Amino acid sequence: MVRLLRTTGRYFIVFEVLVDWVLKIFRQKIFGGGAAFISPQELREVLEDLGGSFLKFGQLAAMRPDYFPEEYCRELLGLLDEVPPIRPELLNGIFLKEYGRFPEEVFQKFERTPLASASFGQVHEAWLKEGERVAVKVQRPFVAEDFASDARFFSFLGWLLRRTGIVRTVNPSQVVREFIHWTERELDYLKEAEHLERLLEQVLRNKFPVKIPKVFEDYSTRRVLVMEFVEGRTLKSYYLEKTPPPRAHKLFKDLIDFELYSYFFDGFFHADPHPANVLVSSSGSLGLIDAGIASEVLVSDRKKMARFVRAVSRDDLEETIKTFLEMVRTPLLGMLAEAKRDYPQHWMRIQFTKNLFMRKIKEELGSLVERWHKASREGGPMHDKSPMHKFMELFQLAERAGIRMPPAGVLYARTFLSIDVAVLELVPDFDIPRSLVEFFDKFDSEFIKLEQTPDEIPLYLRPDLEGEEAEILKMLDEELKTLDRELLTERVSGMMESLE
């Protein structure tokens, strides 16, 4: 009964705020005579009023300039995810449920006043019985239930974002699906503990100057995470003050190198370096916290992405096109196989899909590469030369052609866009393309080893696929390889002539 009343109350709050927003939009359209519109500041205020999951959604949006206009991303970075602390009796209830004891009985000392209190949880300072200082991350009561309720409104929010023209290039429902997927993963603190332990192992093995907190497994549960206390200010605090952190160039170089090495060579990386999750010590050293979003990367995906990133960072036109086509072959193959399976009598539909893809590539790829080369030759702001924005422009190109990029590629771009946004704001003279080239040169021998690592079994050789289905996939794969060679030859020769 309590849960039902809470859910109903949450519905009324969300409904009231969203209705006010919709009415304002349509008043602007009817009486203002123009397009429906909501300013970046108004959107931030709406999300802050809604709180909870909507604040998390805004934080995701702030890191996606490929989805949202830049002025909205910058405004949403300032979202105030600050809420009153969990009431003492509720905090006691959480500990009694998780441990069967009060906080003061679990720890030698437990600071009741949290260091930070956000919509999904809060962090306390404490000391273990053994005397070690720790950070205790406690999930707020009813977070999972509230998120399940809020998720029902996100499709409506997606409609509003499309109606106001804020979301661009993609269907807002795609943004919503991505948000729900990652947020559900963040709600399990034991999963985050596994991520932190694996990242710490990678840091120690590779001797990177990055601090990852040690997890205390015996104290941690699905709703309470106990980890080593890491000193420092968040990168977000510097962002809001618009002042660079100490030793900013080295800090960002260390962060980029760590994320690249983790992705390409370890095959597991911290996929959410949001400014609120990056700690900076007084000496300028780097710490990473909140590893709720981390991901594995297949060897085959790492190889393709490595070739692609190297080509883009070095302005290698021919290799950029070639590696881009390699990356989209797998999702395109899946689309074509699905069409062939569902509509075997309509092979023309499959041919149409392939031709649509070719036409979109031909129409747009040349102008993109020419603009990149112009920015590179003429100097200009770092924003125009950012490899991260090049990646997203290519991904958007594939999206407009009806091709979903591989999840590993999208997650890579999302991760480095988070870094890119902070770098361009705090250290605008930081040369990201040069940093990438230096990384590839430094670890050239590692890339040779990666190229020599066997790929996973091709889709059409999977043991659970037999007969006609396997034959269709194999045939389509061969056809796409032919398509790639034809398109590459035709497009490169045409663009090279236009650039000369």
Write out the residue ranges for each language-model feature.
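Hydrophobic residue at the +6 position relative to the catalytic HRD Asp in the kinase catalytic loop
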Residues: 276-280
